[in-house]
Structures are given as C-alpha cells and as structure tokens.
Amino acid sequence: MYKRQRLTFLGADHEVTGSCHYLQACGKNILVDCGMEQGNDVYENQELPIPAADVDYLLLTHAHIDHSGLIPLLYAKGFRGRIFTTNATKQLCDIMLRDSAHIQMFEAEWRNRKAERSATLKKFVPLYDMEDAQNVMRQFEGYDYGCIIEICDGINIRFTDAGHLLGSASIEVWVEENGVSKKFVFSGDIGNVNKPLIKDPAYIKDADIVVMESTYGDRSHGGTPDYVGELKQIFKRTFARGGNVVIPSFAVGRTQELLYFIRKIKEDNEKDNYLPEFDVYLSLIHI
C-alpha cells in the first residue's frame, strides 16, 4: 500500500531556535537537526515530541546548539540510529555537546544549592549528562561536501557548503518511493558572502520542496560592511576616554571573526600608529 511522504515541523517554525524537522519516507523516520530552544530558560519545554527510539536517521546541518543541542537528549531517550553530517561539524559537535552537558551539570549544582534553601524552588535535572554527550558521538558519521550518500534504499543525500559556520551545510535529500521521485532541500542557516574566514555559500539550483531558514529574510544586507574601519573608530574613541572595549560574542564563528578583524587592526596600526598599543583578552569559555 502506498504511503505518502510526510514532513512535520517539530521546532523553529515560529521562532529562530530549536530547529528540528521530521521527514517520513521509504518506511524510515528521519530528523533534520535536533536543536535546543534558546531563551530565558533554555532547559524548559525541551521534551521531544516523538519517540526517540523510532528515529532511524538524523541529518545535521551544522554544530550550533540551536541545531544540535538536543542530540544527546535524543540518545538518552533511546535513539540509536546513524547521524549524518560533515566532517567539520562532527569534530565541532564533539566539543560543543560536551560543553553543553558541562554547563547544564554546573547549573544544576548551582540551582539545587538554592533549592535546598527554598520551599518553592524545584530540584533541577539536566536534560543530559556528559556520558550521553560522549556516547552519542559514536553514532556520528562525517562526510565531505559534494558526496552523494545512500542512507538506505530509496534515499540519498548530499551536503553543500552553506557558508554559515565551519562545516555548515544545506542538505539535499532525494527520495524515490513507489516509482515517484522527489527532492527535498533543507537550507540550514545560510551565511553571507565575502566573509573573511568562511567560503561563500554554494547555492542549490533545483528542488521539489525547500525548507529554508529566514532569520534575516525581511531585510537587505546591502554591501559588505567595513568591520575593520568601524571597530577601529570604536577603539579610538574608547581609548581616548581611557576606557576598555568589551565585546560579547558567540563562542563559535563570531569570536574567530572578531579576532581576525582585531589582528588586522593591530597589523595596520604597526604602520600608521592610529591607536596606542593594546592587549586583547579572550574569555576561557571561548577557547
């Protein structure tokens, strides 16, 4: 009996975090991303809406926690399927998922000390622990961009550089079932062009169904900003007042770009002495 392919949005449908899509095809249950919602309390409302043990495969677009952060929870709930991603994303997840577990365990210790002194606060239980984060990495398989991978009879996938983060990808999924072929494309997070450390995104030309992120879909970026020039002006104004510049930044991706721009400013400064000499300190959590 012919069964329709089904696509269900489990996360990031009315928000920009917690990305998770559920594709049912060829008798298989496939998740595309399994991200953690991020907001005032990132550990609330994170229950998985499907039985984890029923998931056969997980396709991962990139390592940011809002796309990968619930993978250890999926494992803790019984998922033992294969995880397909790029080589770089696999390596980053090995660091970032363990870091996520460490943060949760540290926060649990802090919250539970407070709960012991309160009649109203409940005991806090992490979504997953370090063992879950380490064990699920055994299910990761890393692949190069451009390779066509058969994940099962009737389903092939390919990763294409999305230009967002080291290892980030858009994923093409070809499904052939009951003599009918369809191509799904999951964009993942798409990067901008002319970035200093990451290649421009490679665009996919055809698809039957496209699932696309649209975080910045309502605005035009215009030309490439002069990040070095703008930072240089901020440094000059702040140093002239005897101040220090503090820059909050995402640990993976943005911090490395900032360090690149600051290095460029220091190199230029050796020639024109536009600024006084200054030191750069990086928070340990960003290393």
What function would you assign to each model-found segment?
Residues 4-59, 68, 75-255, 263-273:
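His/Asp/Glu-rich metal-coordinating catalytic cores
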Residues 1-5, 285-287:
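Conserved small/polar residues in nucleotide/adenosyl-binding loops
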